[in-house]
């Protein structure tokens, strides 16, 4: 179960302590557990949502969104911010885009992107609470983290060395495809037609975002993977809120 704990530690802010330095093979296998980490986070969000039952609507949604951000420690939002800055400031140039992603400072585009994404997510959460459609709180983390697995399965990793390269190089690809299939079936079982709609919208978004990564970078980075997760989570809650 070490790969699961690696995934839970890497993707979240829960107090997980590993027994030692993971081997590269264990890092690669941790990707197989990304969808399960999504289920864990989604279950925690569902529990917190139940605890907030009866709270004023806007406060309920704000606290739920705050918990959602805190669960991941803002890791993926950081990737989204870096990607937004790099995409605009890179002017279509691969090396310039990659260099901007390394810059820890956030520019105006990063700030605007984060505000827009969080505002839309907040509005969607309000709509889901009003319609008593809490399944989106489980589907969004599951689909978002499954998409990260899919990205590593089908997209080159462009930064040599480091954790991302170890994940990409040691991912058991055959098992990864089976995990994605199970995750897809789970979404349909959990949410029925709503799950199918969310999957279809996310498939289109995934294809478009991956196409942008391939055209600009020739692959993906940790930042673009985080951006993908955040945008697909948003796509899920918006889709369910609009149904």
From Swiss-Prot:
Pfam families per record: CobS (PF02654)
Keyword terms, alphabetized: Cell inner membrane, Cell membrane, Cobalamin biosynthesis, Magnesium, Membrane, Transferase, Transmembrane, Transmembrane helix
Membrane-related topology note: Multi-pass membrane protein
Keyword Transmembrane helix annotated: yes
Subcellular location: Cell inner membrane
Regions that span the bilayer: 31-51, 55-75, 109-129, 135-155, 188-208
Enzyme class at the top of the EC tree: transferase
Disulphide bonds in the chain: none
Pathway assigned to this chain's UniProt record: Cofactor biosynthesis; adenosylcobalamin biosynthesis; adenosylcobalamin from cob(II)yrinate a,c-diamide: step 7/7
Function: Joins adenosylcobinamide-GDP and alpha-ribazole to generate adenosylcobalamin (Ado-cobalamin). Also synthesizes adenosylcobalamin 5'-phosphate from adenosylcobinamide-GDP and alpha-ribazole 5'-phosphate.
UniProt-recorded name of the protein: Adenosylcobinamide-GDP ribazoletransferase
Organism whose genome encodes this protein: Pseudomonas syringae pv. tomato (strain ATCC BAA-871 / DC3000)
């Amino acid at each position: 179960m070490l790969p699961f704990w690696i995934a839970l530690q890497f993707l979240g802010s829960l107090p997980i302590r590993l027994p030692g330095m993971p081997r590269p093979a264990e890092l690669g296998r941790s990707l197989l557990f990304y969808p399960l980490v999504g289920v864990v986070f989604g279950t925690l969000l569902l529990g917190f949502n139940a605890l907030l039952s009866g709270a004023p609507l806007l406060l309920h949604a704000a606290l739920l969104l705050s918990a959602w951000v805190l669960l991941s420690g803002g890791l993926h939002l950081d990737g989204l911010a870096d990607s937004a800055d790099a995409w605009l400031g890179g002017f279509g140039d691969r090396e310039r885009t990659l260099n901007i992603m390394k810059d820890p400072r956030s520019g105006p585009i990063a700030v605007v992107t984060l505000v827009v994404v969080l505002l839309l997510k907040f509005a969607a959460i309000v709509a889901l609470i009003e319609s008593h459609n809490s399944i989106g709180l489980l589907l969004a983390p599951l689909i978002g983290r499954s998409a990260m697995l899919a990205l590593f399965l089908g997209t080159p990793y462009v930064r040599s060395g480091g954790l991302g390269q170890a994940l990409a190089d040691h991912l058991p690809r055959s098992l990864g495809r089976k995990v994605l299939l199970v995750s897809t079936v789970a979404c349909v079982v959990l949410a029925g037609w709503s799950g199918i709609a969310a999957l279809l919208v996310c498939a289109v978004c995934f294809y478009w975002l991956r196409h942008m990564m391939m055209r600009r970078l020739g692959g993906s980075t940790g930042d673009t993977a985080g951006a993908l997760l955040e945008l697909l989570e948003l796509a899920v809650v918006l889709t369910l809120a609009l149904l």
